[in-house]
Amino acid sequence: MIGGLLLTGLGCRSRSEPKPAAISAEISIADCMSDLDLNKLDKALQRCNEVVDAHGDKPAALADRSLLLTLMGKTDQACADVTQAMALLRQDSRTADPMVVHELNVRHKSCKQRD
């Protein structure tokens, strides 16, 4: 069931992304999931790590990486990203994309069920 929710989230990636000029113009948050090949998740994770390095203060970057980590079976790391992203949301929820908030709430509940 969780896998279905996660894969559904991949198809529904229509959330908006702010493009601040001060943050790397070369790497956008959307790069994490661009050209995703489920047979090359290690390569996707490497790209996603670069996105998080550039945009680690944005919950969307951590949400995307948590999805990849979950697909790779690295649930503890995925839940750590979810926890960090939720903390960022609590700091500034006014500017958060509602889709990101929803995704993180679903993943957070899933992580809590494992404990």
Describe these PLM feature segments:
Residues 23-47, 54:
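Alpha-helical segment of the N-proximal tetratricopeptide repeat
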Residues 93-115:
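TPR/TPR-like alpha-solenoid helical repeat scaffolds
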Residues 24-25, 59-60, 93:
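Helix-start (N-cap) detector for alpha-helical repeat units in TPR-like alpha-solenoids
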